[in-house]
């Protein structure tokens, strides 16, 4: 048997790599008669043979489209994956957040190796691996009135994958002023909703649906309300489907009817579509006499924070609040039995992680007691108006509400709220407790 030297093997390996490179270059070359590379024809073939896509004509619409995605989170990740896979020519990603370990159960573009990386950069790397034919641009900024127009002007369509009313109103307003169609969705828990706004600049816009924003205290985030990964992922995937339908011209001005699609994953999966009203003549953005113009937005005259409001969590005085450090040194380490600790998180939160000496009374139940000390004693037998009570929640917000209730309605004199809540305590004083 003839032995092959290391030099020959190395040369053969080099020739293999050069051959693969040349083959790739050949596949990527366009014929003068072909609008795409041979590799692209093969990649998108299964998609092009679906009758509704109009074959090569539809694929070229995707290739020539520029789509901006606001948010690379639970909605944006699946939408980005499927839009990139479908062959959108240019995709822009706006997100100034970084990948956190708590994102990974639902934000499927990211992985453990990307924790700490900007989400838009993590998404760009993943998309480049999935489809090198897509041009990806990233914007690691917080979208606001000062940069929105500059970013939006480079694109044809916008996907609103954000989770705050402030951003939703801004995205819709800017899109109306630029004549852009918006595919908008939101999701929380096991539910989500989706709609198309300002279709072909004929409306309706977000303000037509919601002329008045919801009360700030009624809006929860994924961080507060939780989210089921596959449920939010399904809504994000539907966003990609609706985007393709818009680009393929499945929707026309003649057949498009404004709608709101609502999905629920639990206990039984349901998907319902509701007919929505069209453009409103009195709408301040897309109506007959618009007040929300580009000039008004860019100058800061349209105050989105003032319009949408913000939660007021400054319910307690400085004297009614203590730091996690003081709670540890002056209460836990010294006299744990000399105080009552009430944890006002929901029970399923409490069951995940809690102090052993804590008594769990969710803030909703505390409100329902209507200031009755006798009812409170059913859960805390040794409580009195002279008790020393410490109140704890997840982040130090609901605990302020509970502190006010205990002092103002139950007339307990010595009540203190732990600033930053249970998670602040874990971060600063004791890492052994699970943080969810």
From Swiss-Prot:
It is an enzyme of class 2 (transferase). One of its GO terms (molecular function) is URM1 activating enzyme activity. Keywords: ATP-binding, Cytoplasm, Metal-binding, Multifunctional enzyme, Nucleotide-binding, Nucleotidyltransferase, Transferase, tRNA processing, Ubl conjugation pathway, Zinc. ATP binds at residues 74, 95, 102-106, 119, 163-164. Residues 335-434 form the Rhodanese domain. Its cofactor is Zn(2+). Its main location: cytoplasm. Binds 1 zinc ion per subunit. Zn(2+) binds at residues 205, 208, 283, 286. Pathway: tRNA modification; 5-methoxycarbonylmethyl-2-thiouridine-tRNA biosynthesis. The active site is at residues 222, 393. Its EC number is 2.7.7.-, 2.8.1.-. Plays a central role in 2-thiolation of mcm(5)S(2)U at tRNA wobble positions of cytosolic tRNA(Lys), tRNA(Glu) and tRNA(Gln). Acts by mediating the C-terminal thiocarboxylation of sulfur carrier URM1. Its N-terminus first activates URM1 as acyl-adenylate (-COAMP), then the persulfide sulfur on the catalytic cysteine is transferred to URM1 to form thiocarboxylation (-COSH) of its C-terminus. The reaction probably involves hydrogen sulfide that is generated from the persulfide intermediate and that acts as a nucleophile towards URM1. Subsequently, a transient disulfide bond is formed. This is Adenylyltransferase and sulfurtransferase UBA4. It comes from Vanderwaltozyma polyspora (strain ATCC 22028 / DSM 70294 / BCRC 21397 / CBS 2163 / NBRC 10782 / NRRL Y-8283 / UCD 57-17). The gene is UBA4.
């Amino acid at each position: 048997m003839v032995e092959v030297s290391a030099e020959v093997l190395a040369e053969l390996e080099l020739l293999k790599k050069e051959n693969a490179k040349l083959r790739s270059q050949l596949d990527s070359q366009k014929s003068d008669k072909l609008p795409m590379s041979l590799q692209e024809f093969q990649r998108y073939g299964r998609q092009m043979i679906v009758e509704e896509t109009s074959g090569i004509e539809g694929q070229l619409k995707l290739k020539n489209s520029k789509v901006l995605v606001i948010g690379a989170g639970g909605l944006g990740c699946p939408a980005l994956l499927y839009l990139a896979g479908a062959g959108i020519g240019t995709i822009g990603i706006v997100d100034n957040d970084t990948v956190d370990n708590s994102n990974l159960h639902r934000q499927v573009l990211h992985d453990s190796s990307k924790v700490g990386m900007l989400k838009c950069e993590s998404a760009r790397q993943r998309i480049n691996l999935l489809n090198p034919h897509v041009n990806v641009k990233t914007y690691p900024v917080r979208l606001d009135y000062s940069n929105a127009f500059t970013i939006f002007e480079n694109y044809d369509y916008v996907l609103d994958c954000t989770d705050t009313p402030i951003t939703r109103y801004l995205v819709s307003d800017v899109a109306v002023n630029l004549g852009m169609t918006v595919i908008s969705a939101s999701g929380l828990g096991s539910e989500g909703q989706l709609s198309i706004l300002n279709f072909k600049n004929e409306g309706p816009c977000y303000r037509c649906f919601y002329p008045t924003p919801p009360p700030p205290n009624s809006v929860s985030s994924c961080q507060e309300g939780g989210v089921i990964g596959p449920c939010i992922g399904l809504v994000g995937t539907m966003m990609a489907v609706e985007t393709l339908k818009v680009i393929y011209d499945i929707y026309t001005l003649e057949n498009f009817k404004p709608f709101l699609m609502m999905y629920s994953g639990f206990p039984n999966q349901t998907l319902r579509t509701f007919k929505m009203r069209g453009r409103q003549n009195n709408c301040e953005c897309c109506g007959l006499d618009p007040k929300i113009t580009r000039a008004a937005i860019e100058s800061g005259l349209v105050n989105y924070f003032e319009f949408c409001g913000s939660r007021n969590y400054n319910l307690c005085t400085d004297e009614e609040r203590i730091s996690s450090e003081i709670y540890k040194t002056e209460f836990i380490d010294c006299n744990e039995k000399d105080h009552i600790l009430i944890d006002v998180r929901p029970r399923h939160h409490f069951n995940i992680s809690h102090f052993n000496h804590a008594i769990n009374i969710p803030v909703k139940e505390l409100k329902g007691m209507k200031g009755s000390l006798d009812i409170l004693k059913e859960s805390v037998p040794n409580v009195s108006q002279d008790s020393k009570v410490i109140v704890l929640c997840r982040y130090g917000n609901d605990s302020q509400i509970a502190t006010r209730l205990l002092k103002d309605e139950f007339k307990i004199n010595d009540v203190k709220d732990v600033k930053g809540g249970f998670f602040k305590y874990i971060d600063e004083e004791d890492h052994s407790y699970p943080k969810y």
